[in-house]
């Protein structure tokens, strides 16, 4: 009986939230949300271990509604992927949903929850990395403060609550001044470091919305990299709800 009681106490201890970790995660979340709608341009560069590159150009649109966000990514170049589009729907509760339109077969394919850990369009970003994150979908723990480059940062550990996530945990570096996510280390289900994300060149748009100019994902296993270069941010442009559903995927231009 005593052993059982101690075991239950241990489980309860692990389940307890870390107030400081949650507080910092919420502060970082506030930098991502509240923009209403937006659009931007994106250049995706795939980089091989030998330094060979392949470039893709995209348009990205997003719209917030009822506490959730939908994001539409449309490939314009190169020709073999032009017209391919990914629609992601994410929110603080429930499973994220994603649909991929493939123009070659004129078909919309839903990305199943068990497949979201797979690579997005041959990049080092997984489908689950593309969906807008919400702090409620992780268990957080504050670890320490330390330098990250020239900045002072908080370091958090977060564990995905989604049992189908490809990650067991992520280490997140937030700068202390603005609570912007500067670095993430992703660990697989076996606890091994699988890739590292860094964000640089942050700019504040309209005096409120922080966005990075560049994101870099580096695969620790094979040396491949994917660089995302962002530009042309516009906010509050009046995108319609009808632009963010499965039917809209087949008529994107």
Predicted regions and their residues:
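Short, solvent-exposed mixed-charge patches
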Residues: 252-253
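Gly/Pro-enriched, hydrophobic low-complexity segments
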Residues: 26, 76, 87, 97-101, ...
